[in-house]
Regions:
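A generic "structured core" feature
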Residues: 144-146, 150
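Glycine-rich NAD(P)-binding loop of Rossmann-like domains
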Residues: 110-124
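Conserved SAM-binding loop
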Residues: 101-107, 138
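Domain-scale signature associated with acetyltransferase and cell-envelope carbohydrate enzymes
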Residues: 1-98, 122-124, 131-133, 141, ...
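Conserved coupling/switch loop of ABC ATPases
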Residues: 135, 153
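Short acidic, glycine/proline-rich loop/turn micro-motifs
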Residues: 107-110, 173
Length: 176
């Protein structure tokens, strides 16, 4: 009973921070939501965000989480530009989405800069625990990302990838 009351309260707290939120959203005691000035977070219908999930943006960033998507415990969605997670996605625990190199760096003779590119996860994607999805990546519809994979390049639709850096393990996969 206490868990139910706490979940309703934390869902209410999370909804207050969001730009838009669909029907049947549930937030089970997420860690925190920090939105930079001018940023937006849009969450679709029937989304469940588990415990200790962190959503954080820089200024004028966008995060979209599609209908019927699940974000597991300890997942981090960090956006400086845009992170778009499609419909019907299953995101396991402790997954990291990061659309930036985070700190400025320079290769000898070049200007110091931070690399920023949007992340797009298409519909019906399954991402295993402790996977990392880095800047500029598009994960194709129906794909599966293995546990602990570090995704640095686009993943074609219906493809299983794993490893560090992630590589194709199997093509033409399906999952329920």
């Amino acid at each position: 009973m206490f868990d139910n009351i706490r979940d309703r309260y934390t869902t209410w707290l999370v909804k207050r921070e969001l730009t838009s939120c669909g029907k049947n959203f549930r937030g089970r005691n997420p860690g925190y939501i920090f939105l930079g000035k001018g940023s937006e977070v849009h969450i679709g219908d029937n989304v469940l965000i588990e415990r200790k999930v962190r959503i954080s943006t820089g200024e004028n960033a966008r995060i979209y989480i599609g209908d019927d998507t699940y974000l597991g415990d300890g997942t981090n969605v960090l956006s400086v530009k845009e992170v778009n997670i499609g419909r019907g996605c299953a995101i396991s625990w402790h997954v990291l989405f990061m659309d930036t190199s985070s700190h400025p760096f320079a290769i000898r003779g070049q200007e110091l800069r931070t690399l920023i590119e949007p992340i797009r996860v298409e519909d019906h994607v399954w991402i295993g625990c402790r996977a990392v999805i880095l800047k500029g990546v598009t994960v194709g519809e129906g794909s599966v990302i293995a546990n602990n994979a570090v995704v640095t390049r686009d993943v074609p639709p219906r493809t299983l990838v794993g490893g560090n850096p992630a590589r194709v393990i199997k093509e033409d996969v399906t999952w329920e």
